[in-house]
UniProtKB/Swiss-Prot annotation:
Record has Transcription regulation as a keyword: yes
Record-level GO BP terms: regulation of DNA-templated transcription; transcription elongation-coupled chromatin remodeling
Occurrences of domain KOW (ranges): 99-128
Family: Belongs to the archaeal Spt5 family.
Function: Stimulates transcription elongation.
Pfam family, one: Spt5-NGN
Signal peptide segment: none
Organism the protein comes from: Saccharolobus solfataricus (strain ATCC 35092 / DSM 1617 / JCM 11322 / P2)
Subunit relationships: Heterodimer composed of Spt4 and Spt5. Interacts with RNA polymerase (RNAP).
Protein name: Transcription elongation factor Spt5
GO cellular component annotations of the record: ribosome
Length: 152
């Protein structure tokens, strides 16, 4: 059920692994042909084989994808807006820690050791730890999902 002059989300089937290439070709075609009515090209990181277009209608999307290499056609129906928001929203991974917290490493080569948080790199999803049980200062970087907070 397409709504006129509304932003709808269309899933384009794509050859697996070619999502970025198809998105770039779509962008180039939109720019060179000065196509109006396309608002976004979304390449979902966890949805292989699809590129999502935010557009006014099917009458704009179908001619746009015609002849694009590695584009296999449109998926049936529209994607709901809340599904798109789930796909593109950033998810927090692991516990929330601050520098100075004492944590326990729960997996990896340092499993079971106590450590103090030196620095949190949220963009990478990692923390830099100072291992407390070593004889000399030993700093290691581990993913956030490999630690558990012991003391704050």
């Amino acid at each position: 059920m397409e709504k006129p002059n509304m932003r709808n989300y269309y899933a384009i089937k794509v050859v697996g692994g070619q999502e970025i290439n198809v998105a770039l070709m779509l962008e180039e075609r939109i720019k060179t042909n000065n196509i109006k009515g396309i608002y976004a090209i979304i390449v979902p990181p966890n949805l292989k084989g699809y590129v999502v277009l935010e557009a006014e209608g099917l009458h704009i999307v179908k001619p746009l994808i015609a002849g694009i290499r590695n584009a296999r056609g449109l998926a049936q129906g529209l994607l709901p807006r809340d599904e798109i928001l789930k796909i593109v929203s950033r998810k927090t991974v692991g516990p929330t820690v601050k520098p100075g917290d004492v944590v326990e490493v729960i997996s990896g080569p340092f499993r079971g050791t106590q450590a103090q948080v030196i620095r949190v790199e949220e963009a990478k999803g990692e923390v830099v730890l100072n291992i407390l049980e070593s004889a000399f200062p030993l700093q290691v970087t581990v993913p956030l999902d490999q630690i558990k907070v012991s003391k704050r």
